[in-house]
Amino acid sequence: ICSRGVFLQKKRYILHILDDEGISVDKFKYTGVEVVRSTMPKALKPHVKNIIETMIHTKDYNTTNKLFNEMYELFDTLSLDDIAFVMGCKSYSTISQNTGEECNNFKTYKGMPIHAKSAYYYNHLLEKQNLTNKYESVSSGDKVRYFYCKQPNKYGIGSMGYKYNFPKEFSNDIHPDREKMFEKIIFSVFERLYEAVGWKCRKPGEMVQTDLFDLLKL
């Protein structure tokens, strides 16, 4: 038995459960949504769930939005490891064969998956900077962490991957685009949830500007 829930589409929903096969409970069931997928960074999941559960419990826009804004501020303080996407490179050996034929330096082939492309950039830069003895390359079966890069950058790349730790030797030339990361990981999730309940979701950075316009009647 559930008291309420949010339904996004078939097999994608969140329910507040009060009775589980005759046992009284107070829990949430997440099905098919990003917060239960392995691609969402683990460090972010408790915060995302807290906002979702507040949204369902209170049904109050201002209370929920306050937590959403706090999440935006928190996101900017987290380490790269805490916000990077994580995905398995199951067939990197096949992809790397293609890179040898179709990729030239930092130019990749059309349709290359972003996590594979990011792993390729990482491996390529390790070789380019003679760091293969210091850091492990990404191979088939490995998990790769990846993130969107600030533009412009020295290599003209949109994303970068790494295996365990992001090499400090790369940090002068490559920086994470935290605004874009927040948009892809957090904002996109709540944009769909807000829309499902008839709320308007605005990016926290844009809220202040909009509120000022309202205040000044511009």
Model features per residue range: what roles?
Residues 1-218:
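DNA-dependent DNA polymerase catalytic subunits
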